[in-house]
Amino acid sequence: MRVGCDLPYFEDPGEIRAFVRGAEELGFHHLGFSEHVVSGRGTPYPDGFAPDDPWHESFTLLGFLAATTTRVELNTAMVLLPLRPAVLAAKQAAEIDLLSGGRLRLGVAVGWNREEMRALGVDPSTRGALLEEQVTTMRALWRDDVVDVDGVHVRLDGVSMHPRPRRAIPIWMGGGNFATGGVPPTPVVDRMARLADGWKMFAPLSFDLDAAAAAIERVRAAVRAAGRDPDSFGIEARLAPQAVPEEDWLARVEYWTALGVSHLGVANRKGAGGVDAELERLARFVNATRHLWTED
């Protein structure tokens, strides 16, 4: 199992630089973060964040992280893909992957904040169908010399993109919401099974281990039904060290290992204690669980 950590919501670039270098030195395999472009003041934030928490723009931050680190995988969790034109997102992702030496794992999701979507000209009711067309378009732009798309939401007439990435950039999808306890709805499971390289579990689901195990089996069954090999489909579970007693960290990692998940993301997004406190807690986590990680 490959284990990574989240970048806390530090606003200062010096703090970001110190944290990501420290996390890389601790041996984490991947570094994740999420985004919002704008915050809707009238929308309740169900995840404990506030509209004035600092959210960095994903691709700008990825460029900074690519220049700051040397080894760790850069993992968006998630890029709200419908907020961007497919061609622009394809170009940005290709550039980041090229400039980072092939270290991008692109996590995408449809988003939930309707005020944010409307501010960027996106119809919330079509965001799922839009994301599907975006993903297929982006892969075509990364792969093909000339691309034509005649979709409902994306239309291209004989365009090409250079430079193209030197590999197929993995695209993972999120799914689930607070109303369902993080369990992904059936349309989302079907979309992931058809189009994604992996599933990034929504954090609340990681607190209900039985529900998480059932959801994993459901996703794997859908991947199999789509004619794909579930063993080649990645699954990233979550663990929040600040919400799980320290004496239970090892047992929680053992649980995810037994379920056969490919990745684990260690969530610490608030970063209220500062860089040193966050890295100290992560160091304790590494010392307790490192023997269960996949070796590079």
Feature locations, PLM:
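Active-site-adjacent structural elements that line small-molecule/cofactor binding pockets in enzymes
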Residues: 1-296
